[in-house]
Design a protein with these regions (language model features):
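Mature, structured domains of secreted/extracytosolic soluble proteins
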Residues: 4-6, 19-351
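Repetitive helical segments and hydrophobic/amphipathic motifs
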Residues: 11-12
């Protein structure tokens, strides 16, 4: 239920997307006073707490070690080995108990959920560009993560796991279907004290608004509440400056919880409500995602997929690009009483 409160809280707040910056910086162009690279900092943990062997294993397995050694503009939110041990010992979303059980797709979600393009101090997370000369502070609540849409493809083989009483899914109940739960880029959601105060969310005191949203005490004074949260994890070592970006250590492993539709579907005490809202969704064939995945598959010697579908909710107002979604997968109009007010599966939701 805590994740659902978080989803409901940030759904109505602002959006800021950073640009892609994976260019490599020559070794001789790095200023010495900045210290080591992000990769070297993770290996030495000079300014961090604990060891980061598991996180580094993800980095190496995904071929990202050179990027974090040389790329000029990155921000990462790593968890240490103790946090990963808790993750594997817990009832995690992947259902795995060891690193060896992780699939390549799971590894990508774990690493790229904790990474932003652009180098950002924790205090800058909620800032957005106002114009060429000014910045608006305490506005943004999310940034585009490094996760690709094709990293989140799911194959549903069991018809019982598809929305029940929904005829749009009947053609796939016996043969299965490959889906993404949204074809827009997954976001990293962050809560900073400045952003919350700008939205009249109190952050200190035992009964502050943020304690209620989190379901736990978050600090009784300003000093204790002045850190930032990434989803439900807290930054415990922030602004570790490296040659090629910043490291903000978090207390637990970051894993993108998905959009509101996914959270409702996964939480045990919201499954009935999920079944109600899933009556208003359908699988739409997505040619871009299909082509992107197959291009990657051919380059990496993997099997291609004939068709990948996107789960979308019928919406009278807010869906992708801020437009309504009032046509079904066949292009037929959807009755008004079969639409929601907004698309629960839209990762990049923003109020218009």
């Amino acid at each position: 239920m805590k994740k659902l409160f978080l989803c409901a809280s940030f759904a109505c707040l602002g959006l800021f997307c950073s640009c892609q910056k994976d260019e490599l910086v020559p070794e001789d162009s790095k200023p010495e006073w900045l210290g080591s690279s992000i990769y070297e900092e993770l290996k030495s943990a000079t300014h961090l707490t604990g060891t980061f062997d598991t996180y580094l294993r993800l980095v190496k397995d995904l071929g990202y070690d050179e990027v974090l050694s040389r790329t000029g503009s990155k921000t990462i939110f790593p968890a240490n080995d103790d946090a990963f041990a808790r993750f594997f010992a817990s009832k995690n979303a992947f259902g795995v108990t060891s690193y060896e059980q992780l699939t390549p797709a799971m590894k990508k979600q774990l690493l790229y959920s904790s990474m932003l393009d652009n180098a950002m101090l924790a205090s800058m997370l909620s800032n957005v560009k106002a114009d060429d000369n000014n910045v608006s502070r305490g506005v943004a609540v999310k940034h585009a993560s490094n996760i690709s849409v094709i990293d989140s493809i799911t194959t549903i083989y069991n018809g019982a796991l598809m929305p029940q009483g929904n005829t749009y899914w009947d053609a796939y109940r016996t043969k299965g279907i490959n889906v993404v739960y949204d074809a827009t880029k997954p976001m990293i959601v962050h809560f900073t004290r400045e952003q919350m105060l700008n939205n009249n969310i109190t952050t200190t005191g035992t009964d502050c608004d943020f304690s209620i949203i989190r379901g736990e005490k978050v600090g009784t004074n300003i000093a204790n509440s002045d850190t930032a949260y990434i989803f439900q994890t807290r930054i415990i070592n922030q602004d570790v400056t490296c040659q090629n970006g910043y490291v903000h250590q978090v207390n637990d492993v970051i894993l993108n919880p998905g959009n509101i539709g996914q959270v409702l579907r996964s939480e045990g005490n919201t499954k009935l409500f999920s079944r109600i809202v899933d009556y208003h969704c359908a699988p739409y064939y997505n040619a871009i995602t299909t082509n992107d995945y197959n291009s990657w598959a051919r380059q990496n010697g993997e099997a291609t997929i004939d068709s990948i579908f996107e789960v979308r909710y019928f919406a009278s107002a807010h869906s992708q690009d801020g437009r309504p979604n009032v046509l079904d997968p066949s292009g037929n109009p959807v009755a008004a009483n079969h639409r929601l007010n907004w698309d629960l599966g839209w990762n990049q939701y923003y109020p218009s």
